[in-house]
Regions:
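A short, exposed loop/beta-hairpin motif centered on an aromatic-Gly-Thr core
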Residues: 58-77
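A structural detector for beta-sheet-dominated domains
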Residues: 7, 26, 37-41, 54, ...
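Short, intrinsically disordered, low-complexity terminal segments
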Residues: 4, 13, 50-52, 75-77
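A short, structured beta-strand/loop element
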Residues: 32-63
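Intrinsically disordered, low-complexity segments enriched in proline/serine/threonine
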Residues: 13, 28-30, 46, 67-70, ...
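Short intrinsically disordered terminal tails
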Residues: 1-3, 87-94
Length: 94
């Protein structure tokens, strides 16, 4: 357990450490940059959900908007799931 995790006084606080990543996805109109935030929860409700990754932009905006995300027991798993989710649909923003 990392030292910062002991700072959480109540599990309902859902204390999390944040990690930031960026990736670029080529699109017909140019390159779109996504910023992915990964949260590492101090005391997750389920150990397999310790890490949650979420993109800063939605994809598939003109049909059914979708926010790419991923869960996992490791930072790598959550980040990789989010990247796969980004590639599932086209970016249809401005």
């Amino acid at each position: 357990m990392a030292e910062w995790e002991f700072a959480e006084s109540k599990p309902s606080d859902e204390l999390a450490q944040l990690y930031y990543f960026s990736m670029k996805m080529p699109q017909p109109g140019g390159v779109v940059e996504f910023v992915i935030t990964v949260k590492e929860f101090a005391n997750p409700r389920d150990h397999s959900l310790k890490f949650f990754a979420s993109a800063d932009k939605q994809t598939n905006q003109k049909t059914v908007p979708f926010t790419p995300c991923g869960w996992g027991e490791s930072l790598l798993k959550a980040l990789a799931e989010c990247i796969v989710a980004i590639h599932k649909f086209p970016y249809e923003g401005n």
